[in-house]
Amino acid sequence: MSASPSPSTRADALALARWLFVVAFMVVAIVAVGGITRLTESGVSITEWKPVAGTLPPITDAQWQAEFDAYRQTPQFQLVNGPAGMTLATYKFIFFWEWVHRLLARTIGLVFAAPLAWFWIKRRIPEGYKPRLVALLALGALQGAVGWWMVKSGIVNDVKVSHFRLATHLLVALFTLGGLVWTALDLVALSKGEARSRLRGIGLLALAMLVLQLFYGALVAGLRAGTSAGGGWFNWDAWPLMQGSLYPDGVDWATGAVHALLSDVFLVHFIHRWWAWAVVAVLVVVARKLRKTNRKASIVLHSVFGTQVLLGIFTVWSGVALWIAVLHQFVGALLVAATTWSAHLLGARR
């Protein structure tokens, strides 16, 4: 049997956990801002990746004009926004959201890296946690690179970014969020003298199924498939049906099953909306298992996935209204955190 952690180790573990929860909250926030950036078509408004020099926005009229001139070379401007009459004033709006998204990413990097260095130098990181914290730092760096890789696809090849790259960008963010929450919860357990949790059983299944649902949600977003079912408030032909049918008529299988499963707007939307119920069924089981040992976690999980289902329906009925769709993405991130918490509780060694 391992020795009980010392009071100083317990205090250090709790301090680290609080720091990681702050970073996790910031990741949830950047996922929401990323949703705004996507829905306002702002992602390719900044055509260069300058990790340091790009921290400040343009100040002078000449700087703004230079940024606008660079954007005018993109397919998005030449084929969509240019013919629509985009002005410099309109460009400033989409620039703002992409700049905020990148600034928040830089801030998260600083908020993670600086305290990590301090805890490391002060030898306040408990045994066994250094590799995990370094891995989380590496995931953050990877996310920055994936973000630029995604944006580049909309600058060079198309009027919008690749839906595969968008899905990769979102999943790396949510995987990082799950890692932050799980590690923080392990540290909270250490501060109480308890063992680390194990990801297993129904908790592992729930997270795996949720990952697939989030992947298809990202494909729906990247393909602009949210409106493929139709729209209109309380229009049953748009939900639960799709354009009046249970199964959409427009699925194109001609280019092969793999292409249809990953790139057909009707089929991707269909899978996303119905796989959600399989995920809900598993989450109900998880919540019921938690009810006796942690009623609070059970209520939180029920509340979050219930809200997420309603927001998904409202997103369709509203024709993908900006703030409803952003809330859908925001609550999706909260669902990752809530499911991670639930899986951690189920995997606790007693």
From Swiss-Prot:
Q: Alphabetically list the UniProt keywords.
A: Cell membrane, Heme biosynthesis, Iron, Membrane, Metal-binding, Oxidoreductase, Transmembrane, Transmembrane helix
Quote a single Gene Ontology cellular component term: plasma membrane
**Which cofactors are reported in the record for this sequence?**
heme b
Question: Superkingdom of the source?
Answer: Bacteria
Protein localization: Cell membrane
GO molecular function annotations of the record: metal ion binding; oxidoreductase activity, acting on NAD(P)H, heme protein as acceptor
The signal peptide, as residue positions, is none
Q: How does it sit in the membrane?
A: Multi-pass membrane protein
The catalytic activity, as recorded, is: Fe(II)-heme o + 2 A + H2O = Fe(II)-heme a + 2 AH2
Top enzyme class, one word, equals: oxidoreductase
Q: Which sites bind heme?
A: 272, 328
One GO BP on record is: heme A biosynthetic process
E.C. designation(s)? 1.17.99.9
This protein's pathway reads: Porphyrin-containing compound metabolism; heme A biosynthesis; heme A from heme O: step 1/1
Predominant subcellular localization, coarse grouping: membrane
| Membrane-crossing segments per the record | 16-36, 77-97, 101-121, 136-156, 170-190, 201-221, 265-285, 299-321
The record describes its quaternary structure and partners as: Interacts with CtaB.
Listed PANTHER family: CYTOCHROME C OXIDASE ASSEMBLY PROTEIN COX15, CYTOCHROME C OXIDASE ASSEMBLY PROTEIN COX15 HOMOLOG
Q: What does this protein do?
A: Catalyzes the conversion of heme O to heme A by two successive hydroxylations of the methyl group at C8. The first hydroxylation forms heme I, the second hydroxylation results in an unstable dihydroxymethyl group, which spontaneously dehydrates, resulting in the formyl group of heme A.
Write down what this protein is called.
Heme A synthase
